[in-house]
Each structure stands twice: as C-alpha cells, then as structure tokens.
A protein has these predicted regions:
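Alpha/beta-hydrolase fold nucleophile elbow
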Residues: 24-33
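Gly/Ala-rich beta-loop-alpha elbow adjacent to hydrolase catalytic centers
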Residues: 33-37, 41
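Hydrolase active-site cap/lid region
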Residues: 47-91
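Active-site nucleophile elbow and catalytic-triad environment of alpha/beta-hydrolase enzymes
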Residues: 87-104
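Short beta-strand/loop motif that positions the catalytic acidic residue
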Residues: 108, 114-116, 120
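Short alpha-helix in the alpha/beta-hydrolase fold that links the catalytic acid
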Residues: 110, 124-133
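Catalytic histidine-centered segment of alpha/beta-hydrolase-like enzymes
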Residues: 146-157
C-alpha cells in the first residue's frame, strides 16, 4: 500500500525522530530525494516548511500526478496494478491525484535546489522548470544530455552541487 502520501507519512516520522535527538540541530535539517523521493521531499517541504532548512530534489518526479491521471482516465482503477515493475495498489493513483504538487510547493520559501537532466524521458525537465517558477526561492541546475538517473560523472556533479548547496545554506 505504498503511495506518495504514505512515503510522506514515513518521512514525517523520521523528521520528528531526528528533531527529538539532542545531537541534531533541528534548525538545519535538509531533505534530499531523487525521482519519487524528490517529489515526496518537496511535498514535505511544502506541508511542513518550518521543519525543513533546505531541499535538494534530483530529477524530481513531478510528472507522476499527470501519469496517474492518464492511467485513471475513462476506467475504474484495479485493486492492484503493475507500474514500472512495481505491483501497486489503487491508493497509489488515488493519493497521487488527491492534491496538486505545485500548490503545495509554493508554501516552501526556504532554499531549494533542483537538478535535472535535459534528456530525461521519464520525467521531462519541463516539470522542474515549472517548479522553480512556483517555489519562492529555488534554483534549477540543468545537466545537458542527462536522462533519468545519472551516469557516474553526472552523479558526481549532482552530489557536489548538493553538498555545496548545503554548505551555503546551513545556519
């Protein structure tokens, strides 16, 4: 019964647990995620902005809501469905279409870094381009020719960009 909202609920538990630890500076918690993880991290940043110092989303799957709507169009959802090799319950599509991620992320005014390949066929870069127009304080780094999932050189670049972003934005 996995969905973006169940993953978000799991992340909320982790965030609360981290904030309760004496050794953790709860004013400096950064979220990062790739693909659906970037979507979920963005959702948490938008719904609980006071808990998030910074956000890094790498090829975030903002397309998944449109994909779910297309799968639902003109038919009743089956109890389970195989999507990208995963057997998912209908809650996956129901939860994905129950809100608009762009309405959520506009609530996060902290620093955000999006990293996306220009040749991503799974999640077209236009979704991240739209997101940086919606986030109050976001930057998009486009990696020329990169697809969904980076090769080693592009992955290293994304890691270095992410680390630099955290260093620049930590309190």
């Amino acid at each position: 019964e996995m969905s973006v909202l169940t993953e978000a609920a799991d992340m909320e538990v982790v965030l609360d647990g981290l904030a309760a630890l004496a050794k953790i500076d709860s004013n400096n918690i950064f979220l990062a995620g790739q693909s659906q993880g970037g979507f979920v991290a963005s959702y948490i940043a938008g719904t609980q902005p006071e808990k998030v110092r910074g956000l890094v989303a790498i090829f975030p799957a903002y397309v998944l809501q449109d994909d779910a709507r297309k799968r639902m169009e003109g038919r009743e959802l089956p109890e389970t469905e195989e999507i990208m090799g995963l057997l998912l319950g209908k809650i996956y599509a129901e939860d994905a279409t129950s809100f608009d991620i762009y309405d959520v992320i506009k609530n996060y005014s902290g620093p955000a870094l999006l990293i996306h390949g220009t040749a991503d066929q799974l999640v077209p870069i236009e979704y991240s381009r739209r997101a940086v127009e919606v986030f109050p304080s976001a930057e998009l780094v486009e990696i020329e020719g990169a697809g969904h999932g980076f090769d080693r050189a592009d992955e290293d670049r994304a890691i270095n960009l992410s680390l630099e972003f955290v260093k620049e934005n930590i309190l």
